[in-house]
Amino acid sequence: EEIVPGPKSRYRIKVEGKKHTLIIEGATKADSAEYSVMTTGGQSSAKLSVDLRPLKITTPLTDQTVKLGKEVCLKCEISENVPGKWTKNGLPVQEGERLKVVHKGRIHKLVIANALIEDEGEYVFTPDAITVPLVCQIHVIDPPKIILDGLEADNTVTVIAGSKLRLEIPVTGEPPPKAIWSRADKAIMEGSGRIRAESYPDSSTLVIDVAERDDSGVYNINLKNEAGEAHASIKLRLWISLILRLAPNVTEVGDDWCIMNWEPPVYDGGSPILGYFIERKKKQSSRWMRLNFDLCKETTFEPKKMIEGVAYEVRIFAVNAIGISKPSMPSKPFVPLAVTSPPTLLAVDSVTDSSVTMKWRPPDQIGAAGLSGYVLEYCFEGSTSAKQSNENGEAANDLPAEDWSLQTQTGSTRPKFTITGLPTDAKIFVRVKAINAAGASETKYYSQPILVKEIIEPPKIRIPRHLKQTYIRRVGEAVNLVIPFQGKPRPELTWKKDGAEIDKNQINIRNSETDTIIFIRKAERSHSGKYDLEVKVDKYVENASIDIQIVDRPGPPQAVTIEDVWGENVALTWTPPKDDGNAAITGYTIQKADKKSMEWFAVIEHYHRTNATITELVIGN
């Protein structure tokens, strides 16, 4: 590319006698190239390489310590306007709602709007043109907090005389704060004394091995870290315990409730029992939840609002004027479970002279206890008086249990059952219940008595729509036709082809209670014809026909004759093929070939006549 100096060009040419100089103002990386100068007497070339100006760090990154939730701004400045990349602990920084990266000229910023503990770490900014990165540390701190949610009113703790107190107070803060317990301005040391403190990363614990009367009073806890301090006072109250010796007993369980009872304390602590508090928890959890805020005056209680299918435990506390007892032992684990809703859509599927088949749909609501099976019962009409009941939305029969005969037990969830061994012309009532681990559902009754007598249902053949016209298949293809039908008792079926019996060695016929199948593995033209089906039940007869046509490729046209040749045209005639492939001829294809090459090309396709004129031939060929 020729360099043309000009007023607005960065290129200038300086001539001093025989010396010519090319001057590039404001050279950039893009100016790196090979430059040539040519004269009438020769040529000279030189390669130019433009490197970036060495960068200098004007303002380095500085380590920062910031409180939790405050904004962090990491800022650095370099001598040139070049981009760069931020990393945290060796990984690229991902921008988001809280974290923004700003590159403005030579100044580069990383802004964290709301500092979290996980934002702590080593941050590095690496400019694209410098090998030495800029490094700083972010240290997030959080003032300590004391969590007293689990204490009684006025931050009071009651301990039973002679028992061990382990008062665990959750604490938070970053870095983890140092905890100091004290009483009456006297520090409680960590160690092995009867009264001692224990420190953990997320809690601080006051331990009294054997509580004594003089241990009552106010205990102070002080937390301190580099972000701040926190203080709290806890009142310790000592009393003689009520003694609950036995765990409560759960006597009945529902879908989200249970009934529990218990024995009064064997010792009332010298003061009459005022009532009881009840707690429950999930078996896999350690968190107990108080169920009553008003004292329960009785020794029985009904917890509610539990989750079906989840194991629970319950325990109780006795209360007198002095205070609250230790908790009782937890009850044995129990699981709230509900019976299913009743089965639905109970209906008669079929009836014979000695059996009745009933079918139904599973319950709409099954629940956590699942579905174990069904109980189906029947009784004969006239066993007892019947009355109307709307409990299930249908007429139901209120019959004594001894009149009902059990037919199926749990273990099968198939919603269908056949009652066998019934006397002909008897009438029976039927009912069904769903069973699961919680017991039996409400009963679903069939709305009316069922007559034990086979009902003749006249036959009916249901020819599929695609078989109502001629069914066409090619030679060698499979034929598989399914013809549904109805009729009771099981109909007698007869197939004929063109009025004659079907050769079962060539055509397979398969019959079931509801359909018949014609199957031909490899169709031949001899399989074409009219197939007649007769379905007979008692004196009732139903007939239907199917036309099957097995087709093949046609034979060649006959008597191809050149009638006339003129110019570049030729007139042809022919007769249809002797073998039409068992289907109407739909057209002809005419091809031509040069005698020298004998390569055939289609001239006319899908032609319906038996004569044609071919044009545009080459004269002399």
UniProtKB/Swiss-Prot annotation:
<keyword id="KW-0130">Cell adhesion</keyword>
<dbReference type="InterPro" id="IPR013783">
    <property type="entry name" value="Ig-like_fold"/>
</dbReference>
<dbReference type="GO" id="GO:0003779">
    <property type="term" value="F:actin binding"/>
</dbReference>
<keyword id="KW-0787">Thick filament</keyword>
<feature type="modified residue" description="Phosphoserine">
    <location>
        <position position="233"/>
    </location>
</feature>
<feature type="domain" description="Fibronectin type-III 3">
    <location>
        <begin position="556"/>
        <end position="621"/>
    </location>
</feature>
<feature type="domain" description="Ig-like C2-type 2">
    <location>
        <begin position="54"/>
        <end position="142"/>
    </location>
</feature>
<dbReference type="GO" id="GO:0045214">
    <property type="term" value="P:sarcomere organization"/>
</dbReference>
<dbReference type="GO" id="GO:0007155">
    <property type="term" value="P:cell adhesion"/>
</dbReference>
<comment type="subunit">
    <text>Interacts with USP25 (isoform USP25m only); the interaction prevents proteasomal degradation of MYBPC1.</text>
</comment>
<feature type="domain" description="Ig-like C2-type 3">
    <location>
        <begin position="144"/>
        <end position="241"/>
    </location>
</feature>
<dbReference type="InterPro" id="IPR036116">
    <property type="entry name" value="FN3_sf"/>
</dbReference>
<comment type="function">
    <text>Thick filament-associated protein located in the crossbridge region of vertebrate striated muscle a bands. Slow skeletal protein that binds to both myosin and actin. In vitro, binds to native thin filaments and modifies the activity of actin-activated myosin ATPase. May modulate muscle contraction or may play a more structural role.</text>
</comment>
<feature type="modified residue" description="Phosphothreonine">
    <location>
        <position position="420"/>
    </location>
</feature>
<keyword id="KW-0597">Phosphoprotein</keyword>
<dbReference type="InterPro" id="IPR007110">
    <property type="entry name" value="Ig-like_dom"/>
</dbReference>
<dbReference type="InterPro" id="IPR036179">
    <property type="entry name" value="Ig-like_dom_sf"/>
</dbReference>
<dbReference type="Pfam" id="PF07679">
    <property type="entry name" value="I-set"/>
</dbReference>
<dbReference type="GO" id="GO:0006936">
    <property type="term" value="P:muscle contraction"/>
</dbReference>
<dbReference type="GO" id="GO:0032982">
    <property type="term" value="C:myosin filament"/>
</dbReference>
<keyword id="KW-0514">Muscle protein</keyword>
<dbReference type="InterPro" id="IPR013098">
    <property type="entry name" value="Ig_I-set"/>
</dbReference>
<dbReference type="InterPro" id="IPR003599">
    <property type="entry name" value="Ig_sub"/>
</dbReference>
<feature type="modified residue" description="Phosphotyrosine">
    <location>
        <position position="445"/>
    </location>
</feature>
<feature type="domain" description="Ig-like C2-type 4">
    <location>
        <begin position="459"/>
        <end position="553"/>
    </location>
</feature>
<dbReference type="GO" id="GO:0017022">
    <property type="term" value="F:myosin binding"/>
</dbReference>
<dbReference type="InterPro" id="IPR003961">
    <property type="entry name" value="FN3_dom"/>
</dbReference>
<feature type="modified residue" description="Phosphothreonine">
    <location>
        <position position="28"/>
    </location>
</feature>
<dbReference type="Pfam" id="PF00041">
    <property type="entry name" value="fn3"/>
</dbReference>
<protein>
    <recommendedName>
        <fullName>Myosin-binding protein C, slow-type</fullName>
    </recommendedName>
</protein>
<feature type="domain" description="Fibronectin type-III 1">
    <location>
        <begin position="244"/>
        <end position="343"/>
    </location>
</feature>
<feature type="domain" description="Fibronectin type-III 2">
    <location>
        <begin position="344"/>
        <end position="459"/>
    </location>
</feature>
<keyword id="KW-0677">Repeat</keyword>
<dbReference type="GO" id="GO:0048738">
    <property type="term" value="P:cardiac muscle tissue development"/>
</dbReference>
<feature type="domain" description="Ig-like C2-type 1">
    <location>
        <begin position="1"/>
        <end position="53"/>
    </location>
</feature>
<comment type="similarity">
    <text>Belongs to the immunoglobulin superfamily. MyBP family.</text>
</comment>
<dbReference type="InterPro" id="IPR050964">
    <property type="entry name" value="Striated_Muscle_Regulatory"/>
</dbReference>
<keyword id="KW-0393">Immunoglobulin domain</keyword>
<dbReference type="GO" id="GO:0031430">
    <property type="term" value="C:M band"/>
</dbReference>
<keyword id="KW-0009">Actin-binding</keyword>
